[in-house]
């Protein structure tokens, strides 16, 4: 099962009651830049092609990657979970009321320049997602007495289904949040500042099921390597025969795997190779839609995947300022919303993510003629993930996991490891093949030791057997054992 939910809150307040609106501020009806093709340039109810949806999906991806690069990661905040889709909806709705340089700035941040009918295509994704396991809820809270332009309210409702509701109390807001997130985000707000006159809220909820589930009885404790010195104990989901699309990308120096979900969505994992890149250096080179298109056909392989249950809360003002949107928080032109001067006072974000074994069907029982043909994908080190809509290739959620069990105390590693991936994570198909062969042999301790990450010798210097026959010297005689090794923690019974 995959459970993701996110709430994005964008607050607007008065710049000051003593200030007057800019003279000659354009009315919403004549503020449309036809070259940018905002809401009034296209027909309502228009049907868009998959290619047009994928153009928007690419724009959402670039927005998400840019935000990921600007969010802090460290010991106190080791993981990041966000929804580029949710942020795109919030900023796009704000764009409906932005004018002049503020409108251009927002369109640039949304990567919407030169995209015809941007608002219409983005808004058309909402009913599209109703066919998947994704629910999108939006709401516009208005302070009673605040003079908002009717055109902004109507456009927000038409394009993004954002219902206008009176801003009465923090309790009412928190109750809505709790309801749309199925109780996962209670008490979202402590209070509402008196000068807040408008709140744009967006909630994205996804509860999906693996197309092929993991067997809970096989889940066992394993090591997740935080870095070359430290690891943490996690519950590791395992399968010997799991259908997966796996790509070894030499340019990224990473493995890319796609796990199918029910309902036309996929869970993409980008795992840096041992001793090569780390997640921070991979991000600037990442192109999720390109990777998605280059993934090979699905094949059966051995998989180790940590169970994850994480929560994430973050104010996005600093990250958005780093992305060039700092003027939103000082003196933007939002005269399409109201003639009263406004500014954005906060963008608050909360999310959770859970990975567990549940799925729609049992693990595939495809007959594997030889274990030598089975590859291994073992997620035992920091990784990047994305939940991708298969049709539009829009990343519904994205994140970085550097510690899937932040509440557990870290442990010192037994020996030298790569800087980003446990050393029994093979870097090529042949390495994975040798790793599988060694782990399948229970006849000798030397077979168990041959693929160990915790051996005292460096990974590149350890001898890797090519077959069970080689382990026994080709004539049934056991080779000399290396008793400095012990049985690997993540071995999976066939």
Regions found by a protein language model. Give the residues of each.
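Short Gly/aromatic-enriched secondary-structure transition segments
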Residues: 106-110, 214-221, 280-289
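Intrinsically disordered, low-complexity segments
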Residues: 282, 455-458, 471-474
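Non-catalytic, conformational "gating/processing" segments within enzyme and secreted inhibitor domains
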Residues: 24-28, 77-78, 93, 116-278, ...
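Extracytoplasmic/secreted cell-surface and envelope-processing proteins
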Residues: 102-104, 277-279, 312-314, 394-398, ...
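Extended hydrophobic
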Residues: 200, 250-270, 370-415
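Detector for small/aliphatic-rich hydrophobic stretches
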Residues: 2-166, 359-360, 407, 414-415, ...
């Amino acid at each position: 099962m995959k459970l993701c939910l996110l709430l994005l809150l964008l607050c607007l307040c008065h710049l000051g009651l003593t200030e007057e609106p800019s003279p000659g501020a354009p009315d919403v009806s004549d503020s449309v830049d036809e070259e940018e093709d905002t809401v009034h340039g296209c027909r309502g109810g228009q049907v868009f092609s998959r290619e047009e949806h994928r153009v928007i999906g690419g724009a959402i991806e670039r927005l998400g990657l840019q935000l990921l690069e600007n969010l802090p990661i460290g010991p106190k905040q080791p993981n990041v979970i966000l929804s580029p889709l949710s942020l795109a909806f919030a900023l796009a709705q704000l764009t409906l009321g932005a004018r002049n340089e503020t409108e251009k700035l927002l369109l640039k941040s949304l990567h919407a320049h030169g995209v015809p009918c941007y608002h219409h295509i983005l808004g058309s994704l909402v009913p599209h997602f109703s066919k998947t396991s994704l629910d999108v809820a939006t709401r516009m809270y208005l302070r009673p007495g605040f003079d908002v332009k009717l055109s902004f309210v109507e456009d927000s409702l038409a394009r993004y289904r954002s219902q206008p509701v009176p801003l009465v109390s923090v309790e009412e807001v928190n109750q809505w949040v709790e309801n749309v997130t199925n109780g996962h985000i209670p008490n979202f707000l402590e209070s509402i500042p008196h000068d807040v006159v408008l709140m744009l809220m967006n909630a994205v909820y996804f509860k999906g099921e693996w197309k092929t589930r993991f067997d809970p009885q096989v889940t066992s404790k394993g090591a997740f390597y935080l870095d070359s010195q430290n690891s943490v104990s996690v519950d590791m989901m395992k399968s010997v025969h799991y259908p997966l699309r796996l790509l070894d990308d030499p340019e990224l120096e990473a493995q890319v795997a796609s796990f199918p979900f029910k309902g036309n969505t996929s869970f993409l994992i980008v795992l840096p190779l041992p001793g090569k890149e780390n997640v921070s250096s991979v991000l600037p080179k990442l192109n999720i839609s390109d990777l998605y298109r280059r993934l090979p056909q699905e094949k059966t392989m051995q998989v180790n995947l940590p169970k994850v249950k994480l929560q994430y809360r973050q104010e996005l003002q600093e990250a958005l300022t780093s992305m060039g949107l700092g003027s939103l928080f000082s003196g933007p032109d939002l005269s399409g919303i109201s003639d009263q001067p406004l500014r954005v006072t906060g963008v608050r974000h909360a999310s959770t993510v859970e990975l567990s074994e549940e799925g729609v069907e049992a693990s595939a029982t495809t007959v594997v003629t030889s274990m030598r043909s089975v590859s291994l994908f073992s997620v035992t080190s920091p990784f990047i993930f994305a939940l991708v809509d298969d049709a539009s290739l829009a990343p519904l959620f994205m994140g970085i996991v550097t510690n899937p069990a932040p509440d557990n105390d870290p442990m010192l590693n037994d020996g030298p490891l790569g800087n980003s991936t446990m050393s029994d994570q093979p870097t090529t198909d042949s390495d994975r093949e040798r790793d599988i062969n060694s782990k399948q042999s229970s006849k000798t301790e030397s077979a168990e030791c041959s693929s160990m990450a915790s051996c005292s010798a460096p990974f590149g210097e350890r001898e890797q057997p090519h077959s069970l026959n080689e382990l026994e010297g080709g004539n049934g005689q056991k080779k000399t054992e290396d008793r400095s090794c012990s049985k690997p923690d993540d071995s999976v019974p066939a």
